[in-house]
Curated annotation (Swiss-Prot):
Residues 688-704 have a biased composition (Basic residues). It comes from Cryptococcus neoformans var. grubii serotype A (strain H99 / ATCC 208821 / CBS 10515 / FGSC 9487). The C.neoformans mating-type locus is unique, spans >100 kb, and contains more than 20 genes. MAT-encoded products include homologs of regulators of sexual development in other fungi, pheromone and pheromone receptors, divergent components of a MAP kinase cascade, and other proteins with no obvious function in mating. Belongs to the TRAFAC class YlqF/YawG GTPase family. NOG2 subfamily. Pfam families: MMR_HSR1, NGP1NT. This is Nucleolar GTP-binding protein 2. The lineage of its organism: Eukaryota, Fungi, Dikarya, Basidiomycota, Agaricomycotina. GTP binds at G335, Y336, P337, N338, T339, G340, K341, S342, D379, C380, P381, G382, I383. One of its GO terms (molecular function) is GTP binding. GO terms for cellular component: nucleolus. The keyword Signal does not apply. Keywords: GTP-binding, Nucleotide-binding, Nucleus, Ribosome biogenesis. It is found in: Nucleus, Nucleolus. Residues 674-687 have a biased composition (Polar residues). GTPase that associates with pre-60S ribosomal subunits in the nucleolus and is required for their nuclear export and maturation.
Length: 720
C-alpha cells in the first residue's frame, strides 16, 4: 500500500504543528508554556486547578502557614501596639449645647410645618433624637417594652418607686372629672356657635349600623385601596382633587395624615375642581383657607374652556425643576369618586386619554399618562375613607354612589332639602313658593310629588312616582344643576348672623387693609431680595403661580346674598407679571415641551372668554368687540383660501394687524413664534346643522364694497 503525499513530512513542513485545546496553535517543541502546563494538563485545565486551589494558605505538616493566601494579612502586621495618650483620641468630636439643640429643633419644626418649603438635601443627623414626638401628642413610648412589669413590680423590681402619674384614688377621680368637664365645655361651645351637624358629629361620634347595604360601601374595597397605594408609592407629587362645593367633605383625611407621617418626602397639592359651580368669593376663601396646609389651585376641567390649566402645569414644572436629579417625576391624582380626576388629566392633555362619565366609579384601575418628557400623570380610582361620622345619606350626597342603583332614593331627599335653599328648588323645578321652605319627610313628599307630576313620572292610576323623581333630583344635585355650596370658615360679618355695628365693621376693614398693605410690602421686599440673590449666584428664578380668581365664569346663577363678593387682596395684573417674567426667563429651556400638545404655561390669557362661547348672552359692548375680532379672523382665513393676490385695502388691514401683533410679541415673543394652535370654539363661527343661521356678525365696511352677500375671489369667478 503506497504512502500519500501527506505522509511525507519533508514534503509537508507544517505537518508537525497541532492546535492545542486552549485555542493556540503551537509547535511540538515550542518553549512558550503556561505555568502549570505539563504533559497531563494543558493551559486551560491548569488555570482551572489554580482557581480551585487558590485563596488558601499553604501550611506545613504542623499546621503553620508557610505561604499566606492572597489578600491575607500576615501575623507580623498585627503586633501589639500602644495608643498615644492624647485627649483628642478620647474626647468628643462634636459637641453642641442644649440651647443650640432646642433652637435647631424649633427651626426644624417650623420648616417641616411649612407646606411651601421643600427639603432638597437631607443631612446625616440623628433625626429621631431631634424630633420630640412625645411632647406634641405623638406616639406614646412603649413603656411595657422599655420597663417590663416584672422589672418594675414584685421581688425582682430594679427600682424602689414606680413612676406613676396618679398616686391615689382621689387624684384618679379628679383627673376623670376634669376630662369630662372639658368635653362638656367643648360640646356646649359647638352648640352655641351653631356650626351645623358636622361639628357636632365630630364630638359625639355617632355609630353606623354594622349591617349596611353593599352599595354604600363603594370605594372602600381592598382592591380600590390597593390601587391607591400603588399610585402613592409611584408618585413624587400627589394631587388631591377636591369638590369646590364641599372641599372638607371630599378630603380624604386619613390619606393626608398618612402622607404627612409616613411619606413626608412626597409633595401634596390640593386642586379645587368644579369652581364654575360656586361663586367666586367662595372659591377665593376656600383657596385661602386650604393654602395654609398645602398649595391649592382653583381649577375648572374642560378641554376647550378650562381655568387653572396654566397654573397647574407651571406648578408641576416647578416640582420638576426641584427634582432635577431625576429623569422624570410622576404626579398622582387621588380623591373621592366623581370629583374630576380623569377630567383634569384630559384637560392637561387637551384630548380624551381617560374615560370620564358624570357618574362615580368610571375609573377602575390606575393608568399612566405622559404629559411631558419629564412629567408623567397617574390616574387613580376614587376612594372613600371609612368614617363613623358619615351616614348613608352623606355618602349619597357626596356623589359616591350611583343613584340608579339605589333601592330607596327618596329617603335621602329630606337631608338634601336641609342643605339647599328653597328658592333654588323653586327656580330649578318650577315649584310654587312656600313660606319657610320644606322640611322633614312631609316636605320631601310634597316636593317629590310636585316634581313627579310636573315631569310626568307617574305610576298606574296616575300616582306620582316619588322614587323616580328622587333619582332625578339626586342626579341634578350631583351634576351641579341644583345650586349648593358649603360656606368657607369665615367670620360672619354680613347677613342675618351679623350683629356688629357699622363703626366696628369699619375699624375691622381698616385694620384688614393695613395688614394687607404690610403683607404686600413684605412680599415685594422678599421678591427683590430673591432676585438680587439669584443674580449674584446665577440661579434662575422660578416663576410664581398667580390665578385671577375673579375671572372665573360661574355657570350657576346664585341669589344676591350668595353671590356677594369680598375683596380678599388686590389683584395682580397678569400682563405686568408676564412682562417681568419674560425679561427674567428668556433663557428658559424648551426641551420639556417636545412631547406636549399644549404646554399651557400662559394658557390663562389664551383661553376662550365667555363672549366667544356664548355671544348672545354677553354684554353688548363686549360681544361686539369679540365678534369684530372673530370677523377679522374669518376674513383673513377666507382671503388665504380664496384669493391669491390680496388687494390694497387688505394689505393695509394686514399691516395694521401685523403692527398689533408686533406689540404683543414684545411681551411674549417666545410664545407667539411657536407653531402651536390657539384654542378656538368651532360652534361660534360655523353653521352646524343650520342652527346658527340667525347669528348676525357685524360686517367690516372696508372688506366688501359691493353687495352684502356677493362672493369675491376665485369662487365668484367660477360662479359667473
Amino acid at each position: 500500500m503506497g504512502k500519500g503525499k501527506n505522509h511525507d513530512r519533508k514534503a509537508n513542513p507544517g505537518f508537525g504543528k497541532v492546535k492545542s485545546k486552549s485555542g493556540t496553535s503551537t509547535g511540538e517543541f515550542t518553549l512558550k508554556r503556561v505555568k502549570g502546563e505539563n504533559f497531563y494538563r494543558d493551559a486551560k485545565s491548569a488555570s482551572r486547578v489554580k482557581m480551585l486551589n487558590g485563596g488558601k494558605a499553604v501550611r506545613d505538616r504542623d499546621g503553620k502557614i508557610v505561604e499566606a493566601a492572597a489578600f491575607q494579612k500576615g501575623e507580623k502586621e498585627a503586633e501589639p501596639g500602644r495608643v498615644k495618650p492624647d485627649r483628642r483620641w478620647f474626647g468628643n468630636t462634636r459637641v453642641i449645647s442644649q440651647s443650640a439643640l432646642d433652637h435647631f429643633r424649633t427651626a426644624l419644626k417650623e420648616q417641616k410645618a411649612d407646606p411651601y418649603s421643600v427639603l432638597l438635601k437631607r443631612n446625616k443627623l440623628p433625626m429621631g433624637l431631634l424630633q420630640d414626638d412625645t411632647k406634641d401628642g405623638g406616639r406614646r413610648p412603649h413603656i411595657v417594652e422599655t420597663e417590663p412589669f416584672g422589672n418594675t413590680f414584685g421581688p425582682k423590681a430594679q427600682r424602689k418607686r414606680p413612676r406613676l402619674d396618679i398616686g391615689s384614688i382621689e387624684e384618679l377621680g379628679e383627673s376623670s372629672a376634669a376630662s369630662a368637664a372639658a368635653a362638656a365645655a367643648e360640646t356646649a361651645t359647638a352648640e352655641s356657635q351653631g356650626n351645623g351637624t358636622a361639628d357636632l358629629a365630630d364630638i359625639y361620634h355617632p355609630t353606623t349600623s354594622t349591617a349596611r347595604e353593599p352599595i354604600y360601601a363603594k370605594g372602600t374595597s381592598r382592591r380600590i385601596w390597593g390601587e391607591l397605594y400603588k399610585v402613592l408609592d409611584s408618585s413624587d407629587v400627589v394631587i388631591h382633587v377636591l369638590d369646590a362645593r364641599d372641599p372638607l367633605g371630599t378630603r380624604c383625611k386619613p390619606v393626608v395624615e398618612y402622607l404627612r407621617k409616613e411619606k413626608a418626602h412626597k409633595h401634596l397639592v390640593y386642586v379645587l375642581n368644579k369652581v364654575d359651580l360656586v361663586p367666586t368669593w367662595v372659591t377665593a376663601r376656600w383657596v385661602k383657607h386650604l393654602s395654609l396646609s398645602a398649595p391649592t389651585i382653583a381649577f375648572h376641567a374642560s378641554i376647550n374652556n378650562s381655568f387653572g390649566k396654566g397654573s397647574l402645569i407651571q406648578l408641576l414644572r416647578q416640582f420638576s425643576v426641584l427634582h432635577s436629579d431625576k429623569k422624570q417625576i410622576s404626579v398622582g391624582f387621588i380623591g373621592y369618586p366623581n370629583t374630576g380626576k380623569s377630567s383634569i388629566i384630559n384637560t392637561l392633555k387637551k384630548k380624551k386619554v381617560c374615560t370620564v362619565a358624570p357618574i362615580p366609579g368610571e375609573t377602575k384601575v390606575w393608568q399612566y399618562i405622559t404629559l411631558m418628557r419629564r412629567i408623567y400623570l397617574i390616574d387613580c380610582p376614587g376612594i372613600v375613607p371609612v368614617s363613623a361620622k358619615d351616614s348613608d345619606t352623606d355618602t349619597v350626597l357626596k356623589g359616591v354612589v350611583r343613584v340608579e342603583n339605589l333601592a330607596t332614593p327618596a329617603e335621602h331627599i329630606p337631608a338634601l332639602l336641609e342643605r339647599v335653599r328653597p328658592e333654588y328648588l323653586e327656580r330649578t323645578y318650577g315649584l310654587e313658593h312656600v313660606e319657610g321652605g320644606w322640611h322633614g319627610e312631609e316636605g320631601a313628599t310634597f316636593v317629590l310629588t310636585a316634581i313627579a307630576k310636573k315631569s310626568g313620572k307617574l305610576l298606574k292610576g296616575g300616582e306620582p312616582d316619588q322614587e323616580a323623581a328622587a333619582k332625578m333630583v339626586l342626579n341634578d344635585w350631583i351634576r351641579g344643576k341644583v345650586p349648593f355650596f358649603v360656606a368657607p370658615p369665615t367670620k360672619p360679618e354680613s347677613g342675618a348672623d351679623a350683629h356688629v355695628s357699622s363703626a366696628t365693621t369699619e375699624k375691622v376693614q381698616e385694620q384688614e387693609q393695613k395688614e394687607l398693605a404690610e403683607e404686600k410690602e413684605t412680599k415685594e421686599m422678599l421678591e427683590e431680595q430673591e432676585r438680587s440673590l439669584g443674580k449674584v449666584l446665577g440661579i434662575k428664578r422660578v416663576k410664581g403661580v398667580e390665578q385671577p380668581i375673579s375671572k372665573i365664569v360661574t355657570m350657576t346663577k346664585f341669589l344676591g346674598d350668595d353671590a356677594r363678593r369680598y375683596v380678599e387682596e388686590e389683584e395682580v395684573d397678569v400682563d405686568d407679571v408676564d412682562k417681568e417674567m419674560a425679561e427674567e426667563d428668556e433663557d428658559e429651556d424648551e426641551d420639556d415641551d417636545d412631547d406636549v400638545e399644549e404646554s399651557g404655561e400662559d394658557q390663562e390669557e389664551e383661553e376662550l372668554a365667555w363672549d366667544d362661547v356664548f355671544p348672545e348672552e354677553a354684554a353688548g359692548v363686549d360681544a361686539a368687540d369679540g365678534e369684530e375680532v372673530e370677523e377679522d379672523d374669518e376674513e383673513e382665513e377666507g382671503d388665504e383660501d380664496d384669493e391669491d393676490v390680496p388687494s390694497a385695502k387688505q394689505l393695509g388691514k394686514r399691516k395694521a394687524i401685523d403692527s398689533d401683533e408686533e406689540e404683543q410679541t414684545a411681551i411674549k415673543a417666545k410664545r407667539m413664534t411657536t407653531n402651536k394652535q390657539k384654542a378656538s370654539n368651532f360652534y361660534t363661527h360655523a353653521n352646524v346643522k343650520n342652527r346658527n343661521r340667525d347669528r348676525k356678525v357685524p360686517k367690516n365696511p372696508g372688506k366688501r364694497s359691493r353687495g352684502d352677500d356677493e362672493p369675491t375671489g376665485k369662487k365668484a369667478k367660477k360662479r359667473r
